[in-house]
Amino acid sequence: KEETGSDGNTGLCSSYLKYFMEDLADCFGAKGRHVLHASQCLSADVNAAFDPTFPDVMERNNCAYLNHGVCVTKFTGARGKSGTSDASAEFVGTVRQLLDKEQVVWQTGELGKVDGGGGGTVAAYIANLDVDTIDVGVPVLCMHAPFEVVAKIDVYMTYRAFFVFMAS
């Protein structure tokens, strides 16, 4: 539902995840809010890769590139500071250290220049539950076009990033 909005009782903005976590925690004698606060989330979402055909929509020094590994996106949003989700420096450090330790090739990237489009992800909705959350995913060339392009090494490194995160 992300591409059409995450609202309504079937979207991530609904209360179902919070209620589910509270019920699950209750089964083990814990409080849902404590479980959520102690949780960490890698929000699986793609990032825009630099497109040499349209270089003006990206900031070359702050964007993802194909064949440079999984993309870790500290913040998302559009229109300057609107609708953003911003991972804490501490959680970014935790993720970076884990990826480095496990030799996962990674890069950082933004979703485009300020006021040049950009976009949001569902990370903000998870982060609003008091869960440390960061976007991690594959850089994509021609995102949302009929023919999208990704690099095989980036897909593999994304798999590895999630694998080592879940194993830690």
PLM features: what roles do these ranges have?
Residues 23-29, 71-77, 138-140, 164-168:
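Short C-terminal domain-edge/linker segments immediately following a structured domain
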Residues 8-19, 86-94, 117-120, 153-160:
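Conserved active-site and cofactor/substrate-binding residues in soluble primary-metabolism enzymes
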Residues 138-168:
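His/Asp/Glu-rich mid-to-C-terminal helical/loop segments that flank catalytic regions of hydrolases
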Residues 3-11, 81, 85, 112, ...:
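Hydrophobic alpha-helical scaffolding
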Residues 51-54, 58-145:
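Active-site-adjacent substrate-binding region
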Residues 1-65, 71, 117:
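Acidic/histidine-rich catalytic neighborhood of metal-dependent amide-processing enzymes
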Residues 21-28, 50-51, 99, 103, ...:
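Structural signal for hydrophobic packing residues in well-ordered secondary-structure cores
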